[in-house]
Curated annotation (Swiss-Prot):
Protein name in UniProt: 16 kDa phloem protein 2
SUPFAM superfamilies xref list: C2 domain (Calcium/lipid-binding domain, CaLB)
Gene: PP16-2
Disordered: annotated segments: 126-147
Keyword list, A-Z: Calcium, Metal-binding, Plant defense, RNA-binding, Transport
Length: 147
């Protein structure tokens, strides 16, 4: 399995279902890669076609297969509304090294709620040896001692 750095460029979303009945939505995205969570800025007043153009970095390790992108509408005084979620498979970027901006379906309760545009790139870790750094498994090393 790949170990390395995943760069995620959160570009935009289109055709989102409006979760705010009185005003334009203020959408933001929570990105989750295994146990790592990162949030985008709030696209204030951008409604159903927000643009973020933000870059996020995740550390990829054994068993990482997908990235989740959950879209929320920021509300003041009440809990933020969940707009929907996209599941982005990572195998293509592990093979290709980079994926240009691509649309992924946003769904909620198995219903289509729009699309999110994301670009991906992956840089494998260097000097990986069975998942351990050389120094962590007691490899022989020249002594710095002088006599």
């Amino acid at each position: 399995m790949p170990h390395g750095t995943l760069e995620v460029v959160l570009v935009s979303a289109k055709g989102l279902e409006d979760a705010d009945f009185l005003n334009n939505m203020d959408p933001y995205v929570q990105l989750t890669c295994r146990t790592q969570d990162q949030k985008s800025n709030v696209a204030e007043g951008m409604g159903t076609t927000p643009e973020w153009n933000e870059t996020f970095i995740f550390t990829v390790s054994e068993g990482t297969t997908e990235l989740k992108a959950k879209i929320f509408d920021k509300d003041v005084g009440t809990e933020d509304d969940a707009v929907g979620e996209a599941t982005i498979p990572l195998e293509p970027v592990f093979v290709e090294g980079s994926i240009p901006p691509t649309a992924y379906n946003v769904v909620k309760d198995e219903e289509y709620k729009g699309e999110i545009w994301v670009a991906l790139s992956f840089k494998p870790s260097e000097n990986r040896s069975r998942g351990m750094d050389e120094e962590s498994y007691g490899g022989w090393k020249n002594s710095e001692a002088s006599y």
